[in-house]
Structure formats: structure tokens, C-alpha cells
């Protein structure tokens, strides 16, 4: 039975590993009631469950990062609303001036250190030369031991001078670097100051334009224009009324004078008709047209008689008499 199961299942009948491993002990079962049968041995593999603790920690960290990002974005937006370009530019220039002051102080300190090294180097060189001269003098006097000691002193000072020379060269490179950086920062500050003035002017112009736009936005132009239109119509109405009244007054006065002139001409025409009809005597003036009357009317300044008309009428009378 075991051999058949091995053939079908392909599993060996070797003893299995203990429960501490990933394999489980084979199960021995008896089938078909109380009848003894050969035991069937199965190999059951235990599947290791994944550890979930790391995943939970990763999710928590992801949420924390997202929350921190949101908080930073809101904080940056809040800070941006309170930023004034003019004040920020002033602060930036002040900080650059502070950096320039610090660089100048550092340069001064390095220059002082360089000066001290130069003095030490010169002193060591002078001492080395002095001991060399003494060694020559001792050797000339036949004092070899003294000359040897002088040369030892000379070598000590020469080595010290060489060391100081190396330090001095290094110090000079540092000083040159500081000086170049200081000059570069000075040029940057000068450029920043010019840009600051330009940006401040632009910011002021932008603020003014914004205020003007806000003022224009708050003004109700439609109501103002309608009020102007109403006032214009009212003024035009008043002008029309004044013009109409003036025309009425002028027409009334001219009508009165026209009536007066018409009555005077009608009277003269009636008299002329009478003269032509022979109702008046030959050589006499029509009634009311004597020279005395005309002279009197002229002298009295009758406003209803026209001198030109009277002259023309007199000429007509003479012609009618000749006929």
C-alpha cells in the first residue's frame, strides 16, 4: 500500500523533519472502520505566514510623511502671504553686509597671522646667517668645536626658517582666496543693492496698480454713468425750455412791430387809392397828408410813420397829379 501511494504521489517514505522546521509530521490514519489497513503517510508542508508588522510600520511612515508634507505646504503658503518684497530685500542686503563684515574680519586676522609669520621667518633667516658668520669666525680662529656648535645652531634656525616659509606660502594662498572672495562678495552686494532699488520700485508700482484696480473695482461705474446721463438729459431739457421761451418772447415783440407797420402801410395804400379814384382835388394833398401834417408828424416823431415810405408816397402823388 505504501509502495502504491509512493508511486502515485511521488513522495518518499523517508522520516520527516521535526515540527520546528517548515514540515509537519506525517499523519497515520486507519480507514474503513476497525479493519486494519496499512497506514497512509502524507507529507504536509507548513506554509509560513508573512509577517505583517513591517507593512503596518511602512503604512504609518507613509501617512506621517504625507501629513508632514501637507503641514509644510500650508506653512509655506502662510509665510508667503506675510512676506513683503521690500522688507525681504532689505533683510537680504543686511545679511550680505554682515557676511562681508565677517569676511573682512577673517581676512584681517589672517593678514595679521601672515605678518607674524613673515617676522618670524625673517628673524630665523637672520639668526641662521648670524650663526653661519660666527662659525666662519670661529673656524678662522682655529676653534673647530666652537665652529661646529655654531653650525648646529645655524642648522636649527635654517630648519625653522624653512618650516616658517612653508607656512607662510600656505598662509598667502589663504589670504589671496579670502581677498578674492571678499571682492566678489562686494560686487555681489553692489549688484544686489541696484537690483533692490529696481525691485522696490517695481513692487511699489505693483502695489499702487493693485490699489487703483481695487478702487476701480469697488466703484459702481454703471450707476455713475447713468447719473451723468440723467443730468445731461436734464440740462438739455432746461436749454430747450429756455430757447423756446426766448423764441416766444421774440416772436411776440416782432409781431407787435409788424402789426404797427402793416397798419401804417394799409392807411397809405387807402389814401393812394382815393387819390387815384379822383376823390381828392387836383393839386391838393390827400386828407391827413398835408405838408404841415407831415412836418408835424415828422417833428413829433410819430413812430408809426417811416420817412422813406413818406418820400416814396410823395413821389407817387406827384406822378398821379401829372397824369
Curated annotation (Swiss-Prot):
* Biased composition range(s): Low complexity: 290-300
Keyword Transit peptide (UniProt): yes
Which InterPro entries does this one have? PspA_VIPP1 (IPR007157)
The answer, when asked if Iron-sulfur is one of the entry's keywords, is no
The transit peptide is at 1-44
Name a single GO cellular component: chloroplast inner membrane
> Where would you find the membrane-spanning parts of this chain?
none
Major place of residence: plastid
Q: Which UniProt keywords apply?
A: Chloroplast, Coiled coil, Membrane, Plastid, Plastid inner membrane, Plastid outer membrane, Thylakoid, Transit peptide
In this entry, which stretches build a coiled coil?
95-247
Q: How does it sit in the membrane?
A: Peripheral membrane protein
What Pfam families does UniProt report for this protein, alphabetically? PspA_IM30 (PF04012)
For the biological process aspect of GO, one term held by this record is: thylakoid membrane organization
Q: List where in the cell it is found.
A: Plastid, Chloroplast inner membrane; Plastid, Chloroplast outer membrane; Plastid, Chloroplast thylakoid membrane
| Disordered as annotated region, ranges | 276-308
Q: Which family does it belong to?
A: Belongs to the PspA/Vipp/IM30 family.
Tell me the function of this protein: Required for plastid vesicle formation and thylakoid membrane biogenesis, but not for functional assembly of thylakoid protein complexes.
- Spell out the subunit comment: Homomultimer. Complex formation involves interaction via the central alpha-helical domain (71-286).
What is the name listed in the Swiss-Prot or TrEMBL entry for this protein? Membrane-associated protein VIPP1, chloroplastic
**Per the UniProt entry, what species is this protein from, by scientific name?**
Pisum sativum (Garden pea)
Amino acid at each position: 500500500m505504501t509502495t502504491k501511494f509512493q508511486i502515485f504521489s511521488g513522495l518518499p517514505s523517508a522520516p520527516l523533519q521535526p515540527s520546528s522546521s517548515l514540515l509537519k509530521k506525517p499523519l497515520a490514519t486507519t480507514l474503513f472502520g476497525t479493519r486494519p489497513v496499512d497506514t497512509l503517510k502524507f507529507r504536509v508542508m507548513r506554509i509560513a505566514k508573512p509577517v505583517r508588522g513591517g507593512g503596518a510600520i511602512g503604512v504609518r511612515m507613509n501617512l506621517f510623511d504625507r501629513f508632514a508634507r501637507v503641514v509644510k505646504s500650508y506653512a509655506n503658503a502662510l509665510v508667503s502671504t506675510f512676506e513683503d518684497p521690500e522688507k525681504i530685500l532689505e533683510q537680504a542686503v543686511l545679511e550680505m553686509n554682515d557676511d562681508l563684515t565677517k569676511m573682512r574680519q577673517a581676512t584681517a586676522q589672517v593678514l595679521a597671522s601672515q605678518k607674524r609669520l613673515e617676522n618670524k621667518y625673517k628673524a630665523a633667516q637672520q639668526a641662521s646667517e648670524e650663526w653661519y658668520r660666527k662659525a666662519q669666525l670661529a673656524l678662522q680662529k682655529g676653534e673647530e668645536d666652537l665652529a661646529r656648535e655654531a653650525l648646529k645652531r645655524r642648522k636649527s634656525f635654517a630648519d625653522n626658517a624653512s618650516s616658517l616659509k612653508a607656512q607662510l606660502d600656505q598662509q598667502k594662498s589663504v589670504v589671496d582666496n579670502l581677498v578674492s572672495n571678499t571682492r566678489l562678495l562686494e560686487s555681489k552686494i553692489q549688484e544686489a543693492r541696484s537690483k533692490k532699488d529696481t525691485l522696490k520700485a517695481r513692487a511699489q508700482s505693483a502695489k499702487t496698480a493693485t490699489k487703483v484696480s481695487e478702487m476701480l473695482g469697488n466703484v459702481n461705474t454703471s450707476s455713475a454713468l447713468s447719473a451723468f446721463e440723467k443730468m445731461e438729459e436734464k440740462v438739455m431739457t432746461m436749454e430747450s425750455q429756455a430757447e423756446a421761451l426766448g423764441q416766444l418772447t421774440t416772436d411776440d415783440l416782432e409781431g407787435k412791430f409788424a402789426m404797427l407797420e402793416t397798419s401804417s402801410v394799409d392807411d397809405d395804400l387807402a389814401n393812394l387809392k382815393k387819390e387815384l379814384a379822383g376823390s381828392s382835388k387836383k393839386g391838393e394833398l390827400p386828407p391827413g397828408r398835408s405838408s404841415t401834417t407831415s412836418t408835424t408828424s415828422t417833428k413829433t416823431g410819430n413812430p408809426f410813420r417811416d420817412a422813406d415810405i413818406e418820400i416814396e408816397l410823395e413821389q407817387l402823388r406827384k406822378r398821379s397829379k401829372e397824369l
